[in-house]
Amino acid sequence: MSDSFDRAPEQTKPQRAPPSSQDKIPQQNSESAMAKPQVVVAPVLMSKLSANAPEFYPSGYSSNYTESYEDGCEDYPTLSEYVQDFLNHLTEQPGSFETEIEQFAETLNGWVTTDDALQELVELIYQQATSIPNFSYMGARLCNYLSHHLTISPQSGNFRQLLLQRCRTEYEAKDQAAKGDEVTRKRFHAFVLFLGELYLNLEIKGTNGQVTRADILQVGLRELLNALFSNPMDDNLICAVKLLKLTGSVLEDTWKEKGKTDMEEIIQRIENVVLDANCSRDVKQMLLKLVELRSSNWGRVHATSTYREATPENDPNYFMNEPTFYTSDGVPFTAADPDYQEKYQELLEREDFFPDYEENGTDLSGAGDPYLDDIDDEMDPEIEEAYEKFCLESERKRKQ
C-alpha cells in the first residue's frame, strides 16, 4: 500500500494564537473595566487516532488473501494450498475471474514445473468443478484459459490432455455409475454437467488458427445420455434434461452439419420414457417441456419478416422482449449492445430451464427434496392436455 494508507497523520499540539484587539471584550461599565481581557480560543477536538493503529479493512475483506496474491505464492507452503485458495476465491467471487486469472496463470508457470505438479493441478480443479455445483461453469472457463496459457508440456501430456484423461477415467464407469446408489449417481451427475460445460467452453485451436470444440467430448456426451436414459430413475432423467438444456442446441447444430440424426434418436428415447418409464409425473412434465423447447429450436429466436430475414437493422422489434443481463460491475446490457452480443447469447443459452430450481437442484420455492418434491399436485391444464395429445399421437404412430 502507499504511505498514505500505512499510517495516520502525526498529531501536533494546537498552538494558541496571541491575543489581539479583536479578542478583547468591550467594556460595559467601570467594574468591567478592571477585569482582565478575555481571549476566545476555538475549541479543539482531541482525536483518539493513533499513528500505530492497525490498518482498517471492511468486514468480509481478507487481507491475507490479497497480500498473498500480490506477492505470488510466497506465503503458501504447497501448490495445493495456493490453488485451493484461489479456487475457493473464484467460487465466492466469480466476477474476479477476468482480473485475476492472468496473475494466477503466471504464478502457476513458475511453480508447476513437473509432471506430478501438473497432475495435482488438474485433479484439484476437477474435484472443485464436480463437488461444487455452481463451479462447473467457472471450472470449465478456468480449464480453457490454463490449456492455452500454461507453458509446461511434459511427455505425459499437457494440461488439456491430462484433463481429458481424468474425465475419461470417470466416463468409463458411466454404466455402473448410472445404476449405482444415490451418492454414486449424484457424483456421476456432477461429472456429466461439468463435461457439458467443458464441451461448450474448451476451445481447441487448429493448425490454421481456427477455433473448434473437442469432438471427443461430443461423442462422450452422446454416450452419457444413453447411460442416463437406459436407467430412467428420476434423478438420472433430471440430469439428462439439464444436460440437453445446456448443450442441446449446440449438439444438434453440430450433428446436422455432419448429416447425423442423433437428436431425433434422443427425442425418440424421451418419448419412450414418457410413455413407458415409471418415473414421477413431474419428471415426465419436465421431459415434455424439453421436447417442446426443442421443437421451438431450443428457444432461439429467428424471426423473419415478409420479404427478408429480420435483423437489428431492418426490424425495430428485433430485440423486443429480450431479457436484460448485468456485468460483474452491475452494468446492464441487452442483445442490442454490440460489445456484449457474444456474452449475451452465452447467458441466454445458460438460463436455467427450471425457474424454481438452482443449478444444484435446490428448490427455491421451499424446503424439501431438491429433485423429487412435487411442484404441484396436478399438471397444469394446458400441460395435461398436451400430454394426452402426445400419448394419443404416439400410440397412433405405434399402430401404423
UniProtKB/Swiss-Prot annotation:
Disulfide bond sites: none
GO biological process, alphabetically ordered: CRD-mediated mRNA stabilization; negative regulation of nuclear-transcribed mRNA catabolic process, deadenylation-dependent decay; positive regulation of cytoplasmic translation
Tagged with keyword Cytoplasm: yes
One example GO MF annotation: RNA binding
KW Cytoplasm (keyword) present: yes
Positions of transmembrane segments: none
Keyword field: Cytoplasm, Translation regulation
Region (PAIP1 middle domain (PAIP1M)): 78-296
One Pfam family linked to the record: MIF4G
Gene Ontology CC: one annotated term: cytosol
InterPro entries in the cross-refs: ARM-type_fold, MIF4G-like_typ-3, mRNA_TranslReg/HistoneTransl, PAM2_motif
Every MIF4G domain range: 80-297
Positions of region (PABPC1-interacting motif-1 (PAM1)): 361-400
Compartments in which it is found: Cytoplasm
Biased composition (Basic and acidic residues): 1-10
Compositionally biased region (Polar residues): 12-32
Secretion signal span: none
Chain spans, region PABPC1-interacting motif-2 (PAM2): 37-64
Region span, Disordered: 1-36, 356-376
Domain notes: Only the PABPC1-interacting motif-1 (PAM1) stimulates translation initiation.
Quaternary structure annotation from Swiss-Prot or TrEMBL: Interacts with the RRM1-RRM2 and C-terminus regions of PABPC1 in a 1:1 stoichiometry. Interacts with EIF4A.
Function: Acts as a coactivator in the regulation of translation initiation of poly(A)-containing mRNAs. Its stimulatory activity on translation is mediated via its action on PABPC1. Competes with PAIP2 for binding to PABPC1. Its association with EIF4A and PABPC1 may potentiate contacts between mRNA termini. May also be involved in translationally coupled mRNA turnover. Implicated with other RNA-binding proteins in the cytoplasmic deadenylation/translational and decay interplay of the FOS mRNA mediated by the major coding-region determinant of instability (mCRD) domain.
The name this protein goes by in its record: Polyadenylate-binding protein-interacting protein 1
